[in-house]
Structures are given as C-alpha cells and as structure tokens.
C-alpha cells in the first residue's frame, strides 16, 4: 500500500474569525457505514443552527467524509480533497482517511482546518466552532470506541423510502487483507432496544426498506451479551412496520440455524443473503485468515438452500491474493459455476500497510489479477442472466425510486436487488396509463430481463397509490 500522494505547494492562509456561522456542505465517500456517520454529522450541525447546503459551491466549509479501505478509495478521497482545496474551500476531513493519515493530511493540505476520526464524528459541532475561532483541530482518537444510536440527531441522505441502520461498529476479526479494524476499532454492538427504537423512528418517516449494516452483521451482540444475538434482533425487527428488512455483510460462520430460522420465520426479513466469502480454496482462505476448512463454504450454501430454497445469494470475492495459483483460481471459477449465485462482486487484491497480507510473499502480478477478475465476471454474467430470467412472467413487488413524468417510465427495485450494488427494475405505466410515485411499493408484471436488470409493467389495482399519466 502506498500513502496517498498529497499536495504541499499551496501556501497556508489564516482562518478568519467569523461573526456568523459559516455555511457547510458535505462530500460523502465510501461505504454505507460511512454514510450513516455523515448523516449524523448533518443532523448535529443542523440542530446546532448551521446552514447545511447540498451544493459544495455555496458553502464556505466542506466536510469530506473519506474512505481508506483500499488504494483506489484513498486516491478518490485525495482527488476530492485537492479539488475542493483548489476551489478555496476550508476543509474538515473526517472518516477513515483521517483516522489513517492524520498527520500527513494536516501537513500536506493547508486548507485542512480539522481532521475528525471515525470514533469522533459526534464532536463535529465543537470541531467546527474551534475552526471558526481560528484553531486547527486534530480530533482523532487512537482507539475508536463510540457508536451512534437513536438519540443522536440524523439527517438522511438516501431516498425517502430507504434507510441504513448501523447495528454495530468496528470488527473483532482480523482478516489478513483488511485494514478496517485498525481504522474503526473493535466491535461495539448497540442494544436490541436501541436498534428497534431507531427502526420505529424510521418507519414513522415512511421508510419502506431498512438495511442492517455493520462490519460483521451476523456477529451482532457478541461483545455486548457474551453471545451473538442476531436472530433475536431479527425477531424483534419483525414487529416494526417496515415491509422490507435487508441484511448486508453476513459472515459465513454467523449464519447459525437460529439465524436462518429467523430469515425463514420473520415476514419482513428478506431472504437475501449478502455473503462475503472472498474465495473458495482452503489454501487461499487460510492465508486470508478466513474460515478455511475443506468445503466450509459449500456446506454453508447447502444449509442455506435447504432452509431457504428461494433465497437470493450475493457474494464478494478477491482474486490475486498473494500465493493464489492458477489452480487456486480454477477452483474458485468452478465454485462459482457450480453454486450459481444471483449476484457476484469481484475485487483484485490491494496490499494494505498494517495488515498481515501486506508482508506475504508470492505476490500475483496485477495484470494477472485483473485478467482473473475479468474471467470470473465473464463466467458469472450468463448465470446472473439465467437467474433474472426466471422472474419473467411473474408479478412481484417493486419499490419505486424514480419517476419520469414526461414518459411515464419508473425505476425501482424488487427484493432481490439491493441499492447500488445490484440491478434495477424498469417499470412502464399500466395498461390504464397509471403510474406509481417514488416511495411506493407496487405490483409489477415482469416482461423482460438481462444480466443485471428486469423490465416490467405496472399492474392495475385499486390498492396502490398512483398518479394518472399526464397527457403531453
């Protein structure tokens, strides 16, 4: 891993003392866990009376919530910072890059008036006040311990109908390739009651899809209760008036019989399993410090399909890990072809200083790793197309997220598609010309499919909120 290439040629300028609160904008980068932190900072600043703009051009100060998971993410964060600095913006750098490279950022970017660590975003109002007073602030805890809850102000940035709910922060596992525990600390779970209370708040705001996130969601509760309580959490969320509860980041060993039973029994918990398996070959999994015993992933998938035969399965994989041979890769390719996942994401290995994998020998040439990624995705595409094609001719529920009043076309998602990472459903008006508004869940008859997306037509019914098609 290389440190981000930062700029040091811009002269330092003093921070002027301001009588009025400055306008503030946010630039969000990285994962949805980072998004929740951004939303809390937005809520805190709004509550404190700051003018929060959605346009960086209108703001005097820009809070950049950064990502530092892999080299590409760091480079994107640095490009964003430099671009804003060149516009003359004062910067508050938050998130994983701030946690990772705090001194380098302050030394190299004069416009950086403050840095805020991953466990310190709750202090954003105090940090901004100190910046207004002319201070340059380093608010980064060496060992993050904070986790936000339902009492912390929050201003959502997602579509009205979709919300992310962080059930825990940090991670107790030490996968060889992952820097996250060093950036976000050990696992800190929220109490069940706290999570359910926030879910009720979100339901009152009209949320139709609640997405549970943490680093290892299925490990929820182990630190707090002495044993995982994810099954109990899912059961409790079954009492919340939100039609879809989706789970991201399900670590394989956490999918116990009790958890699978909750998926099966709780009506609003979607049978959508996001499984970061990373690889299939025991040698590679062992080097990754992942569950590696022979056929461990095969047995897990067999158990899932036995308990949840209609489950939608997504996985993420890493190719080019140090020591991965052609035989190892072929094992992975055969695994993908045999298991026939609905959705697959593939990443090439990114060496990170401070992780065990950074010092491993037998690095795979980046061009070979990239070619393996392309081969794996080419193998998966016809599988994904076949999995989608099964839905043609069926009527399914679709959550509408976009609507073009000129054409009548709508875009939404069904329960087999998670936001951002999976496909979409293109929805045409019903035979009577009816259209559905964003934020509504409506029946759609599926008429077509491709590798990633579905196409369908709104079903005429008196039970849904619709708007009449406007004549042109």
From Swiss-Prot:
Binding site for [4Fe-4S] cluster 2: 171, 175, 178
Cofactor: [4Fe-4S] cluster
MTTase N-terminal domain boundaries: 22-133
Binding of [4Fe-4S] cluster 1, residues: 31, 67, 96
Assigned EC number: 2.8.4.4
Domain TRAM: residue ranges: 389-460
Record-linked Pfam families: Radical_SAM (PF04055), TRAM_2 (PF18693), UPF0004 (PF00919)
Transport as UniProt keyword: no
Residues covered by the Radical SAM core domain: 157-386
Predominant localisation class: cytoplasm
GO biological process: tRNA modification
Similarity-based family: Belongs to the methylthiotransferase family. RimO subfamily.
Record's cofactor remark: Binds 2 [4Fe-4S] clusters. One cluster is coordinated with 3 cysteines and an exchangeable S-adenosyl-L-methionine.
Species annotation: Prochlorococcus marinus (strain MIT 9303)
MF (Gene Ontology): 4 iron, 4 sulfur cluster binding; aspartic acid methylthiotransferase activity; metal ion binding; protein methylthiotransferase activity
GO cellular component, one term: cytosol
InterPro entries in the record: Elp3/MiaA/NifB-like_rSAM, Methylthiotransferase, Methylthiotransferase_CS, Methylthiotransferase_N, Methylthiotransferase_N_sf, NA-bd_OB-fold, Ribosomal_uS12_MeSTrfase_RimO, rSAM
Cellular localization per UniProt: Cytoplasm
Known role: Catalyzes the methylthiolation of an aspartic acid residue of ribosomal protein uS12.
Protein name as it appears in the record: Ribosomal protein uS12 methylthiotransferase RimO
Catalysed reactions listed for this entry: L-aspartate(89)-[ribosomal protein uS12]-hydrogen + (sulfur carrier)-SH + AH2 + 2 S-adenosyl-L-methionine = 3-methylsulfanyl-L-aspartate(89)-[ribosomal protein uS12]-hydrogen + (sulfur carrier)-H + 5'-deoxyadenosine + L-methionine + A + S-adenosyl-L-homocysteine + 2 H(+)
PANTHER family per record: RIBOSOMAL PROTEIN S12 METHYLTHIOTRANSFERASE RIMO, RIBOSOMAL PROTEIN US12 METHYLTHIOTRANSFERASE RIMO
Domain of life of the organism encoding this protein: Bacteria
